[in-house]
Amino acid sequence: MSCGIANAIRWDVSLLIHRSMSSSMSSVQPTSPVSDSPSLGEMHASVAVSRRGHWGFRLLAFLGPGYMVSVGYMDPGNWATGLAGGSRFGYMLLSVILLSNVMAIVLQALAARLGIASDMDLAQACRARYSRGTTLALWVVCELAIIACDLAEVIGTAIALNLLLGVPIIWGVVITAVDVVLVLLLMHRGFRALEAFVIALLLVIFGCFVVQIVLAAPPLQEVLGGFVPRWQVVADPQALYLAIGIVGATVMPHNLYLHSSIVQTRAYPRTPVGRRSALRWAVADSTLALMLALFINASILILAAAVFHAQHHFDVEEIEQAYQLLAPVLGVGVAATLFATALLASGINSTVTATLAGQIVMEGFLRLRLRPWLRRVLTRGLAIVPVIVVVALYGEQGTGRLLLLSQVILSMQLPFAVIPLLRCVADRKVMGALVAPRWLMVVAWLIAGVIVVLNVKLLGDYAVHLMVGVSD
């Protein structure tokens, strides 16, 4: 980013907070119609893109949005489902992680296509396409997904602080409320600073898991066999529950809104040729980033299978339990510390992207702009309350089940983001020359069908479970 562009988009954080707090009513600012305002207006087209030179430099200019999106694919919610799946079923659910990642690559590519082709994010496109009632319903569902995601971040960060520093869970939850300062400072530095911060923490997570996998030394043949799909995943209700949780933890609803917006931060030529070139680079960016997410998610499950399942610890659902077992089983104390460090980095990273997603969703659906600090406080406040209630009623051991439940909730909300996305990218009036080809739409609708069928199956199992419970 050139110095002129960077200076043009910098925020005065102190002035922002002063103006926002001067009047609670003035914090809510109606904007001009969304169709007239670019998504994330202050960061729109703020990152310079070289139009010439070596392809590597052009790729570097586009690298970033995909890695910010990938954060949602390796947040603390993935840890809970991966640990539970690996400890209970060994390597069997690796096939679900692989399938989920392929689904994510396709859906994120479509989200990037929508943003680049239409100059709208998914929330803006939904608002332009649907009635007011439908738009409001989609907004509510998306906000619930963001809160469920934030719930996982709160729990994960609080647990990491407890494991590393001995901070009680309930105080760790309270500490997470002040992360708004971090978000504001990063936004003040510009979009490239946000991306650099996120990528740095991703590298920390990656490094931690490389060391842990080397220490665990899982059998390669069994690991590779786990990537082959098995019918037992669908036939076993417990395996299906965890599989749906993995899908929910991997393919995040709000990531589709986020990606369709932040790809527009690049200052590519808004011409047919410029858009097509930008789409190629954006898809390369997101695919590379999601392959990193695949490695990390698979590593969590492989670690659980190699360390816990192999030692007959079949019910490791709590992250704290995994931390306590890692050092004795592996015989290396640093493994547990690396595990907790990666968890903390994951929770902090997710904070940044969840804040951006919340801002995009509210502005796109409602034409309503909140100050970033207020938006963050509202979302985090709604996520903190259920965690505090669960800790107060059931103790710290209840957070693990709450974490798993949050991922299943996310999966249940996926159709409400995926189906509008598919309808938009198939509309030539919206997409122009970049309308999604028929073969891609067939693949995308198959993915949507899998998501819907899995959720219907889960609801059916829940209904049967409830009826059996009542009859008993």
UniProtKB/Swiss-Prot annotation:
Organism: Xylella fastidiosa (strain 9a5c)
Keyword hit for Transmembrane helix: yes
Main location group: membrane
Lineage: Bacteria, Pseudomonadati, Pseudomonadota, Gammaproteobacteria, Lysobacterales
Keywords in alphabetical order: Cell inner membrane, Cell membrane, Ion transport, Membrane, Symport, Transmembrane, Transmembrane helix, Transport
Annotated family: Belongs to the NRAMP family.
Domain of life: Bacteria
HAMAP family per UniProt: NRAMP
A Pfam family of this chain: Nramp
Transmembrane segments: 59-79, 92-112, 136-156, 167-187, 196-216, 233-253, 288-308, 325-345, 377-397, 402-422, 439-459
Name the record gives this protein: Divalent metal cation transporter MntH
Membrane topology of the entry: Multi-pass membrane protein
GO biological process, one term: iron ion transmembrane transport
Primary role: H(+)-stimulated, divalent metal cation uptake system.
One function term, GO molecular function aspect: manganese ion transmembrane transporter activity
Cellular component GO terms held in the UniProt record: plasma membrane
Subcellular location as annotated: Cell inner membrane
